């Protein structure tokens, strides 16, 4: 189960450490703490914003307090939705639910920005199109064509992993 919160990694560890059967912190610098409670595994990530250097797909991470800012950094609108708890209220600032209903694949921000920031998202787009039958928007297709050369900054292992998921 993936959760996002305005709590910092230190606050997450302090709150859940005493009740966790296991707790792992490999992703802590990106704001992610893993927790196992009983037979359930949770990844809890602090809301964040990211910025990228032009020659890297590794983000500079800044923790935030607003889930909407966190959703803006997601790869596609269908992944940029959240349920606000304890009352289940859908937070959908980029109309991901409508895109899901229309089988449409779109990025929350301009696709050129999204694919420049993280070129691996172009391969993820291919996987979502093939695996879920989503139809890409014309601007997404144009951005993939224009940014295909950016895949050179992605490690071969990451490309292989994404192609394995595609197949």
Label each region the model flagged:
Residues 1-167:
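Catalytic cores of the polymerase beta-like nucleotidyltransferase superfamily
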